[in-house]
């Protein structure tokens, strides 16, 4: 029996776009700009750098940034700094986001019912969905107007904690009807947390994703099946 959901909450990396985009394009782009970021930091960026350093033993900014990126640490200050650097890359046309064609169609078809939840900052999420490579031809698509909202670590909490999903459900008015929403991600740990909050879940299986053996969740290979 086909289930009908009123709200869709989507992960980004490995779900709506390839893991390779983040790891092989966005992260290297940021690392290439580290020295420029530090040397030309505005007041907000200086505050973010100082906050990050204070929480990581006062290490030198450049080496700390590279270390946190290499270890994929979900540091809020790092995510904010990455968002600011990527904003310049999107604005210059150096970066466009390769969102899967089926995900583009799904978001367009379900306008106003799709939320994004990522460890990347809300700013980075808006940039990504505002600069999508057009899968049907040339040019860039802006999908932000089709999306109902964005959540990140500061807004909701870490994605491996059930309370984070409870906060999202409360924010969108579904705390009493968690089963009316579905969360899609390539991470079993995230699905475990979301499921504990009462959300329905699907495991995204995309090219390049880590293989999940003995998966206990229904898989989704593209959004035409949702």
Curated annotation (Swiss-Prot):
Keyword Metal-binding: yes
Alphabetically ordered keywords of this record: Amino-acid biosynthesis, Cytoplasm, Hydrolase, Magnesium, Metal-binding, Methionine biosynthesis, Nucleus
Cofactor(s) annotated in UniProt: Mg(2+)
Localization annotation: Cytoplasm; Nucleus
Catalytic activity: 5-methylsulfanyl-2,3-dioxopentyl phosphate + H2O = 1,2-dihydroxy-5-(methylsulfanyl)pent-1-en-3-one + phosphate
EC numbers, comma separated: 3.1.3.77
InterPro entries: Enolase-ppase_E1, ENOPH1_eukaryotes, HAD-like_sf, HAD_sf
Pfam families per UniProt: Hydrolase
GO terms under cellular component: cytoplasm; nucleus
Molecular-function GO term, any one: acireductone synthase activity
Pathway: Amino-acid biosynthesis; L-methionine biosynthesis via salvage pathway; L-methionine from S-methyl-5-thio-alpha-D-ribose 1-phosphate: step 3/6; Amino-acid biosynthesis; L-methionine biosynthesis via salvage pathway; L-methionine from S-methyl-5-thio-alpha-D-ribose 1-phosphate: step 4/6
Binding sites annotated in the UniProt record for Mg(2+): 11, 13, 186
GO biological process, any: L-methionine salvage from methylthioadenosine
Cofactor remark: Binds 1 Mg(2+) ion per subunit.
Purpose of the protein: Bifunctional enzyme that catalyzes the enolization of 2,3-diketo-5-methylthiopentyl-1-phosphate (DK-MTP-1-P) into the intermediate 2-hydroxy-3-keto-5-methylthiopentenyl-1-phosphate (HK-MTPenyl-1-P), which is then dephosphorylated to form the acireductone 1,2-dihydroxy-3-keto-5-methylthiopentene (DHK-MTPene).
Assembly and oligomerization: Monomer.
Family affiliation: Belongs to the HAD-like hydrolase superfamily. MasA/MtnC family.
Listed name of the protein: Enolase-phosphatase E1
Organism: Eremothecium gossypii (strain ATCC 10895 / CBS 109.51 / FGSC 9923 / NRRL Y-1056) (Yeast)
